[in-house]
UniProtKB/Swiss-Prot annotation:
Species of origin: Gibberella zeae (strain ATCC MYA-4620 / CBS 123657 / FGSC 9075 / NRRL 31084 / PH-1)
Name the UniProt record assigns to this protein: Peptidyl-prolyl cis-trans isomerase H
GO biological process: protein folding
Subcellular location: Nucleus
Keywords: Isomerase, Nucleus, Rotamase
Gene: CYP3
PPIase cyclophilin-type domain location: 15-181
Taxonomic lineage of the native organism: Eukaryota, Fungi, Dikarya, Ascomycota, Pezizomycotina
Family matches, as PROSITE patterns: CSA_PPIASE_1, CSA_PPIASE_2
Domain of life where this protein originates: Eukaryota
Gene Ontology terms for molecular function: cyclosporin A binding; peptidyl-prolyl cis-trans isomerase activity
UniProt xrefs under SUPFAM superfamilies: Cyclophilin-like
Amino acid sequence: MPPTKLPESGNPLVFFDITIGGEPLGRITFELFKDVVPKTAENFRQFCTGESKTPVGRPQGYKGSKFHRIIPNFMCQGGDFLNGDGTGSTCIWGFKSFEDENFTLKHDQPGLLSMANAGPNTNGSQFFITTVPTPFLDNKHVVFGKVFEGMDVVKKMEATKTGYRGKDMPNLDVVISQCGEM
């Protein structure tokens, strides 16, 4: 596999190595839009690298966490490394959530990385990857990145059967087995 070329924007690149049911699926590389939403991008980047620490100094982040919600023709949601079921959230500043940075970027294409939230100003560790344009999410969820390489992996995740363990929960664990910065 040839080395990943960095984006001309100078924005950071991070990656997820994904497994389904314990079997390697592939790598997704994301460009984080630090130039537009620096705070939101940095929150995600630190959870990818493991730089973020709990109050007692333990690393915390996405490595080993699951995508707990997958809806075909919509999105794949993950980032709850606290509880694994969509109920947990935190941010790198030691709070449960932080404010919406801005809504400059729109949900106008597949492969966008956006903050999952429970309403205005409730961003934390949870995120989703769009699989189609989702303009109805504009001005409600902060777009902070996009798939740079590996949309084929996202589409395979999207095709994972759901429903056995909960309506939108994958039947097989979809796990971020490794993650970091390029």
